[in-house]
Amino acid sequence: MSKTTNWVGQNLTLTIEKVAHGGIFVARHDGRVVFVSHVLPGEKVLAQVYEDRGGSFCRAEPIQIIEPSGDRVPQVWKQAGPQGAGGAEFGHIKLARQRELKADVLEEALDRMAGIKLRPVVEAAPGDDEANGLGYRTRLQLHVDEAGTVGPYRERSHEVIKVKDLPLAVEDLRELEMHNKNFQNVKKIELAASSTGQVQWKIDSKLKGDER
């Protein structure tokens, strides 16, 4: 293992091995695990380390896909991806491959936590393929900045992004166009849509003395 104790800012050439929990992927470099987002198993990438607290692992994001996977597609939410809006961690992957990767994560968790040897099957719900992985989320958590802008956080930050749409949400939530509204003295807005089209709201107000 390298004597380097902090790799932040370093560019590493990596071959991605497998998926991990949370929509990130695993590579190894110089005896350490490197967790990388927005990649695919089998890809060769150039990635920059952005977090290293010492120990056996660090975290990086891709800056160049040297050898892309055949399962890579353009990000379905154009404002997501590296340094973009969080929440579309698999948006760059073909739907069939997404399901395989989710089954991989579940299989590993069952084995590790319960000792169960089982290969799960993740199947498409009716209409999923036609929707291209969009319009499925029945819950949204949006944040509000000091100017009243409503939107998701930028990946790995508490910066609210002004987005043009919320394409992962079901139509009952999208049509509210929360991202086009302005809220004062509000920290967070949570929305949930039922199967009958009803929408529940929860608004967290910003109280005096709250430093967020």
For each of these PLM feature ranges, what is it?
Residues 1-212:
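Accessory RNA-recognition modules of RNA-modification enzymes
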